[in-house]
Amino acid sequence: TQSVRALLFDLQGNLLDKAQVAIDTYQSPQPGWLENDPEAFWRSLCDACQQLWAHTRVPRDSVRGVVITTQRGTTVALDADGQPLRPAMIWLDQRRATAIPPLRWWWDAALRAIGMRDTVRFFQREAEANWIAQHQPELWARTAHYLLLSGYLNYRFTGRFVDSVASQVGYVPFDYRRGRWAAGWDWKWQALPIRRSMLPELVPAGTVIGEVDARVAQDTGIPQGLPVIAGAADKIELEKALR
């Protein structure tokens, strides 16, 4: 959250070199709000990579792949051309929706019966998508792609709307037990204004999702053609590292 880091590891997982760029572009238009221009995340990523290449002794042609890991729960809304419609809402943002979509009566009754109705309402109030739909309905109507930050950076690297199942931490219609988007009948699709077409394809961590193109290679200094591999959200990666 505080910075972007570019890290070089060997095939045994040993850290060989790193560079770090502080993120100083966060904005708080109102108390409790926290946003950042998605393009600012990208520029910081590019700067960190270029700083790494400027001082490392590791040859670029020895690098074999790229993995992106990001802060969890930060959301990005894009239009049909893949352009950001508004600043990214950061996971620390405290705004809450007050007008939430109604659930069908049978879901409402079932959730009430098992004592989960208030929990689902909390989920709805916390969901960034519900806040945007309530307060910026014209913008939400133009939203063609709704991504977590990891999905946005994967898109910038590869031109594909693909993300890792291990990065889906946030108020999105994800089935955590099965590791996929929720089934069409699931209450989450009624609790949120998100359509399935807005969401990225999900793949397991470790899957090759694309490759570095010429434009990205120029911006980041990462060699063109390297595979981009699905990673995991920051907390998940930290937990794995501490095992």
Describe each model-derived feature in a short phrase.
Residues 1-87, 142, 217-227:
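N-terminal glycine/serine-rich phosphate-binding loop of ATP-dependent small-molecule kinases
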